[in-house]
Swiss-Prot record:
Swiss-Prot/TrEMBL cofactor(s): Zn(2+)
Organism: Salinibacter ruber (strain DSM 13855 / M31)
Cofactor: how bound: Binds 1 zinc ion per subunit.
Protein name: 5-methyltetrahydropteroyltriglutamate--homocysteine methyltransferase
Binding site for 5-methyltetrahydropteroyltri-L-glutamate: R16, E17, L18, K19, K121, R528, C529, W574, E618
Length: 769
């Protein structure tokens, strides 16, 4: 019979129980034992839920207090030397220190602090993992038995699970080496014995199969990296009497498919949502007789109810070729990336609820597909019929389908993505209109969010205060922020965004086509959870979104005020996106809505408008040969949003990451008049790519690190400005912080900005002398 399996379940709990427990421990409100009890209760609940839903293969060790890659670091003893660890078991405090760093008070005065390990995006998802660190001195030993302990814990509960572990090759490739002459794969020989020991201990505990995640198989790999996979699994296949199930996800294997199919393993998992063609490719290549395929047919990264009839055809294709005993049915990836349970959503209409499937509902779909493939039509027909009705309803829904929006997208032409004149002609007009000096100063948008702001927004949402009371408060905050900036001496001001919480949610709630959940939480990193909006229908803007507050801000000053908007690509990337049309089409709809807002801001006298695109690079496909298509439509959408204005109106954008070399041409094609970037920590190194490319427009490299509470001195910011001027012309450069100031306090922000303005004035005097 076909096997219903799962690769991973959300660990946070349906109501973010894990977040509260871990943060309670960090604050000292919970003891270690109380934290462990809370975690065990969550695990037991998750295993019971999945077993009751009918899964044949339930995962364990998918739970984590913080991150699964950090768990693997603890398992193999990959603890950087700067952390106080005695080389035995990695305890809970060492584990959290690796993720969060140590402050002086944690170290009893022995040191001033220990920096946390780096965190970065998990492939092209919105989850973040802790980056392993490797050096010539790195050694490995079994230093955490969590994977074995949790297998035994589940077994005691009556659930025989399949433990999940990051595979050894991906573990090394996901890390960073601390020496230029060290290749992470040089450590494979030392790492494999620890993995072999884990497999043997699992086998001794009665475990029959282990899931080894090798997501790097969907990336562009070198011959040496493919050889490392062969070496690793040849060794692990002989390590213990246990089945090896290798999971790949987030894309197709493409040229790595032969390597994966030839590994000495028992099951290979294929993502058939982002690599739907690879089942046919695998069957055409030839699947070894002793290899079963796990079919990732249920989308583990989106929230839509599956088309079960269509997916059944895929499952039956595999069964016809391999037989039912060699086919597993599962999600495309771990269900970590979707909310826990649709039944916790009281705010969605009954009709809308039928459109979606969260983790619990996705497991129901997996089980139904496996059972239907085994001929159990009567038992599964209700869910299949629910799937049919949902897809038919979406196709016919007036809420989803807006002919006016579709017609407008169809009418987009090249002229809508071009400014009237090139930047070289626009720039002098803008400098005159805005009365800008050399090296103008500004900020990125947000100012400190106080407890009062958060409280007033919450009270207004709950109807505890009137609209007039709320708006009076917001006006007061804006006026204070404008006055503070004038006192500091900034050249272009912002209104401070006191009315905004999340930068995507704020706009999404004002756009038709977006839906929001109450409990649709997913883990971003550690205890940080987010509720991504759902782009469910055609997107349009029923009325202006920001002109009310920007007009008020503009009336408070004679200094230019910059409008702040979230860009279409970022709105797309940080949402669950509809699956019934291309992402490019949805992005164009958002871009048209933002375009309308840009033009309205211009009409009310805002002459500088910033369209933030922090997620622009995140949208890059994992395979380089797919980049051009994405960059073509992503750049088009930014230009569609920004190109309707007059030459005198200055368009800014902001990107907060430091790798531009491989997309610098696309950034130039966006044709923003000014791009501000995070640069202070890298000491302006990222400007090398702008300099080498001869970037034509204006740049604001950050000179104030807003991620730290310290106040940078005038002298150090002067030095950064002068360093930047080695790569940029004075007429090309702006002076600004790295990012928005929302998370900082006024006592830090005020003196930091005063020093920044003074530094700019000092360098300006010399540059213009």
């Amino acid at each position: 019979m076909a096997t219903a399996s799962n690769l991973g379940y959300p660990r946070i709990g349906a109501h973010r129980e894990l977040k509260r427990a871990v943060e309670g421990y960090w604050k000292g409100d919970l003891t270690k034992d109380e934290l462990r009890d809370s975690a065990q209760a969550l695990r037991e609940s998750h295993w019971a839920t999945q077993q009751e839903l009918g899964l044949d293969v339930v995962p364990s060790n998918d739970f984590s207090y913080y991150d699964q890659v950090l768990d693997a670091c603890a398992m193999v003893g990959a603890v950087p030397e700067r952390f106080p660890w005695d080389g035995t078991e990695v305890d809970l405090d060492t584990y959290f220190a690796m993720a969060r760093g140590l402050q002086e008070k944690d170290l009893e005065g022995e040191e001033s602090g220990v920096q946390a390990m780096e965190m970065t995006k998990w492939f092209d998802t919105n989850y973040h993992y802790i980056v392993p660190e490797f050096s010539h001195d790195t050694t490995f030993s079994l230093s955490s038995t969590k994977v074995i302990d949790e297998y035994e814990e589940a077994k005691a509960q009556g659930v025989d699970t399949r433990p999940v572990v990051i595979g050894p090759v991906s573990f090394l490739l996901l890390g960073k080496t601390q020496a230029d002459d060290l290749d992470a794969l040089d450590l494979l020989d030392d790492l494999l014995p620890v993995y072999a020991e884990v497999l043997q201990e699992l086998a001794d505990a009665g475990c029959e199969a282990v899931q080894l995640d090798e997501p790097n198989l969907v990336l562009d790999l070198s011959d040496a990296e493919r050889a490392a996979l062969d070496q690793a699994y040849e060794a692990l296949a002989d390590a213990a009497d246990i089945e090896l199930h290798v999971a790949t996800y987030f894309g197709g294997l493409e040229d790595n498919l032969p390597t994966a199919l030839d590994l000495p393993i028992d099951v290979l998992h294929l993502d058939l949502t982002r690599g739907e063609e690879q089942l046919d490719e695998a069957l055409d290549h030839g699947v070894p007789d002793d290899l079963a395929l796990s079919l990732g047919v249920i989308d583990g990264r989106n929230v839509w109810r599956a088309d079960l009839d269509a997916l059944l055809g895929t499952v039956e294709t595999a069964i016809d070729a391999l037989g039912t005993d060699r086919v597993l049915v599962g999600p495309s990836c771990s269900l970590l990336h979707v909310p826990v349970d649709l039944d916790t959503e009281p705010g969605l209409s009954d009709e809308m609820k039928t459109w979606f499937a969260f983790a619990t509902q996705k497991i129901e779909e997996i089980v139904a597909l496996a059972e239907r493939a085994d001929g159990h039509e009567d038992a599964t027909e209700a869910l299949f019929e629910k799937s049919r009705r949902a897809h038919a309803a979406r196709a016919e829904s007036d809420w989803i389908n807006d002919a006016a929006v579709q017609d407008r997208v169809a009418g987009i032409d090249a002229s809508m993505t071009e400014r009237d004149s090139p930047h070289s002609s626009r720039s002098p007009l803008q400098r005159e209109a805005l009365d800008l000096p050399t090296l103008p100063t500004t900020t990125i948008g947000s100012f400190p969010q106080t407890d009062d702001m958060r409280r007033m927004r919450a009270q207004y949402k709950k109807d505890e205060i009137s609209k007039d009371e709320y708006e009076d408060f917001i006006e007061e905050q804006i006026a204070d922020t404008i006055a503070a900036q004038e006192e500091i001496g900034l050249d272009v001001l912002v209104h401070g965004e006191p009315e905004r919480g999340d930068m995507v949610e704020h706009f999404g709630r004002q756009l038709d086509g977006f839906l929001f959940t109450e409990n649709g939480w997913v883990q971003s990193y550690g205890t940080r959870c987010v509720r991504p909006p759902i782009i469910a229908g055609d997107v349009s803007r029923p009325e202006p979104m920001t002109t009310r507050w920007l007009s008020y801000a503009n009336d408070q000053t004679d200094t230019p005020v910059k409008g702040m908007l979230t860009g279409p690509v970022t709105m797309l990337q940080w949402s669950f996106v509809r699956d019934d049309q291309s992402r490019a089409e949805t992005c164009r709809q958002i871009a048209l809505a933002i375009r309308d807002e840009v033009l309205d801001l211009e009409d009310v006298g805002i002459q500088a408008i910033q369209i933030d695109e922090p997620a622009f690079r995140e949208g890059l496909p994992l395979r380089e040969h797919q980049w051009d298509d994405y960059l073509d439509w992503a750049v088009e959408c930014f230009r569609l949003a920004s190109s309707g204005v007059r030459d005198e109106t200055q368009i800014h954008t902001h990107m907060c990451y430091s790798e531009f070399n491989d997309i610098i041409e696309a950034i130039a094609d966006m044709d923003a008049d000014v791009i501000s970037v995070e640069a202070s920590r890298s000491k302006m190194e990222l400007l090398d790519s702008f300099d080498a490319f001869d970037y034509p427009n204006e740049i604001g490299p950050g000179v104030y690190d807003i991620h730290s509470p310290r106040v940078p001195s005038v002298e150090e910011m002067e030095e950064l400005i002068r360093t930047a001027l080695d790569a940029l012309e004075p007429s090309q450069m702006w002076v600004n912080p790295d990012c928005g100031l929302k998370t900082r306090r006024w006592v830090e922000v005020q003196p930091s900005l005063e020093n920044m303005v003074q530094a700019a004035e000092n360098v300006r005097e010399r540059a213009t002398a």
